[in-house]
């Protein structure tokens, strides 16, 4: 991508579609033990139940909100200035970091001094980068292992609970039937958490700051939060917490601009992206990343080898440890929260891919495989892994240990190359934990349904319960254009089995670079998969939103049905295609069945008839059938009648 004349930093504006509040929703904040712990949630208001159905109050539902200040009407949004440094005071108070005089990476200094990039550079506040003081470790894992509950951990505990207790109390206080209503709306099917006996899959009824600390200390969860990304709202990735999703964005050599990528980021978090990976491979990667980080309230991940490759003009064999090291420092000083590093692609595994249908499909994996073969040497990522850990813990960058040998077709699933790399990732995890560096493990890929659980079981065993982060997996290879669905099936399954974060797949997978519409489609599909996994695991409170929507559906509260859904806009659009009038929003039927065949309307009629007759619903059904039988005989006992 050349300097795009359509993007000038002086003209940059936030995407208007990303800042509009969702229908019947407002941003609320829950305050923690200190005033600056203000945890955002989305409050969805509901209409009262119609008097014909009992006329009760329906209190607001609270849902997890990843949109940051963008959907807060009281926030002043200026992407040229960036977001407020929410965590800055917490970082300062710990007293274990130092502010550097300037950038220390060679490339970072070059870009800052290059007049050719001046019109593209982020113009807002340029903070001096921070780094751990000599001899200090500033990772959330280190604090957790010292028994310290950080403000980030308290923030996360409040966020994960989603005000569920307050919601149930408001139901109890709603009227004479409040206790019964709370019991009904809080009801949840028992889940099945796989591996609970052998591994710690056991979320408590209420998430506490101490529970967060303990899970991070054990390595079962990570809090990606670089000290140079103070704008981020703390979140957690771990299988005893809500399943999270990641959205990939990024330019390429042939398409997109900085402005488009910032728009994709704000669009992705509006619809529920918990983290965003900037996978840019075109020019101006450094400047694009700075704009994204300074405006992102969610953790940002990257694959540093992509930018390192650009620095050697795309020739993998010219890569060196020194170039890669400088790239790590450059990105850590900008504020990247987690790095995908393909240190498990070892020379000995490359020949194992020779008999594959689709070979090595990971870009990072193929880069390192080519380097290993060109030099006939062990990967410099593997050889220098301890040094990488030293860099990571100086900034609190988390590892996302890359699956460079993941299968690119179901034909190649669970083969020797994939599983050999997974074992190595387990060994590297132990090394990282020795440095108190946070780790998650990346997983496949393309895997048929019957082989998915094996992936999860082996990962838990070999990687000692480090969080699993998977791309799908795609369960079939026959649906280009629909791979958000082929992968959504696998994502729901592996999330149920224990995966902590799901990397979204858009309809453009294997076909092209996703646009904003594709990003939304991928996000919604994966929010659905993650939620289905939470339900299947029996995660506390996971069913509250389902119950609220089902109640709204039964009571024909159409607007509430739309607003409680993952995509209110699409739900309303589909309803309006056949019933566009406002009167249809209060009708006791929809266009699918019409007024005479609506099953829920028939059920309501039965209940009304039962109340009028003073009998139970079962007796009412029996009595109603007797009346209809008499009518049938009187009409001549004919099944069909000519009109």
Swiss-Prot record:
Keywords noted in UniProt: 4Fe-4S, Iron, Iron-sulfur, Lyase, Metal-binding, S-adenosyl-L-methionine, Thiamine biosynthesis, Zinc
Pfam families, alphabetized: ThiC-associated (PF13667), ThiC_Rad_SAM (PF01964)
Residues the entry annotates as binding [4Fe-4S] cluster: 590, 593, 598
Domain of life, source organism: Bacteria
Cofactor binding, per record: Binds 1 [4Fe-4S] cluster per subunit. The cluster is coordinated with 3 cysteines and an exchangeable S-adenosyl-L-methionine.
EC number per UniProt: 4.1.99.17
InterPro entries associated with the record: ThiC, ThiC-associated_dom, ThiC/Bza_core_dom, ThiC/BzaA/B
Biological process per Gene Ontology, one example term: thiamine diphosphate biosynthetic process
Cofactor annotation: [4Fe-4S] cluster
Catalytic activity: 5-amino-1-(5-phospho-beta-D-ribosyl)imidazole + S-adenosyl-L-methionine = 4-amino-2-methyl-5-(phosphooxymethyl)pyrimidine + CO + 5'-deoxyadenosine + formate + L-methionine + 3 H(+)
Name the record gives this protein: Phosphomethylpyrimidine synthase
Gene: thiC
